[in-house]
Amino acid sequence: MKVLAIKLVDYREWTERLGYDREWLIQKIQNKFMMKIHEIASQYSTFPLQLRFDNFLMIVDGITNTQLIYMINDMQENLPVGIKTCLGYGKTPLEAQWNASVCLNNKEDKFKEYVDEKIAALHFDINFNTEALKYTSVYDSFLEITNIYVDLSRFLYKIGGILQYLGGDNYLGFVSTNSVNKVIEKFSDDNKIKVGIGIGQNARTAIKLATTSLEKIRNNREKTWHIEEEYH
């Protein structure tokens, strides 16, 4: 699988130049440029996992190196600092992002040609969480969401996957297609979490299919997982 690692260069120095009354401004600018990056990424059929904001990842199977270069140039035009990128390859998203991350510390960031793989996206949703908000505090609900995020992250890490919190009670994960059965086995009898699985040629399609799967689960309350796959 192919993962693009993106690092904002001299990001800390940029934030420090904003003065002491800066946290609100940092959040404003971060959200503004991430909104633009999401828009650009969607045009190239990928999706940014924003993670730390100053470092983020993209699953880029199904995208040519030429398209990646155009996308990176488009992103650079909308960021307040320079960026460094590196393309990593691995049997799993976890391995690919590790190789891409190591590459970020090297002087050269040339893109090698790698084989594209199908992408498996996972859209997790917590059952009854919205209803539970009536009986707990906003902060306690957030703590529960955070604990589940940690548990899901650890599980996916063990099978070579990566995870991003989407907001609310939703999470987005990526695994290799070889690990999908492990996900199904884990959540087939789980009455707390449902997972929509999508398999596609690129990240955007895989995520769309994962969300489609999740909606089908919601319409059939007896199921805890469903899978949709793109065929060519």
Curated annotation (Swiss-Prot):
<comment type="similarity">
    <text>Belongs to the archaeal-type GTP cyclohydrolase family.</text>
</comment>
<keyword id="KW-0547">Nucleotide-binding</keyword>
<protein>
    <recommendedName>
        <fullName>GTP cyclohydrolase III</fullName>
        <ecNumber>3.5.4.29</ecNumber>
    </recommendedName>
</protein>
<comment type="function">
    <text>Catalyzes the formation of 2-amino-5-formylamino-6-ribofuranosylamino-4(3H)-pyrimidinone ribonucleotide monophosphate and inorganic phosphate from GTP. Also has an independent pyrophosphate phosphohydrolase activity.</text>
</comment>
<dbReference type="GO" id="GO:0009058">
    <property type="term" value="P:biosynthetic process"/>
</dbReference>
<keyword id="KW-0378">Hydrolase</keyword>
<dbReference type="InterPro" id="IPR029787">
    <property type="entry name" value="Nucleotide_cyclase"/>
</dbReference>
<dbReference type="GO" id="GO:0043740">
    <property type="term" value="F:GTP cyclohydrolase IIa activity"/>
</dbReference>
<dbReference type="InterPro" id="IPR007839">
    <property type="entry name" value="GTP_CycHdrlase_3"/>
</dbReference>
<dbReference type="InterPro" id="IPR043128">
    <property type="entry name" value="Rev_trsase/Diguanyl_cyclase"/>
</dbReference>
<keyword id="KW-0342">GTP-binding</keyword>
<dbReference type="GO" id="GO:0005525">
    <property type="term" value="F:GTP binding"/>
</dbReference>
<dbReference type="Pfam" id="PF05165">
    <property type="entry name" value="GCH_III"/>
</dbReference>
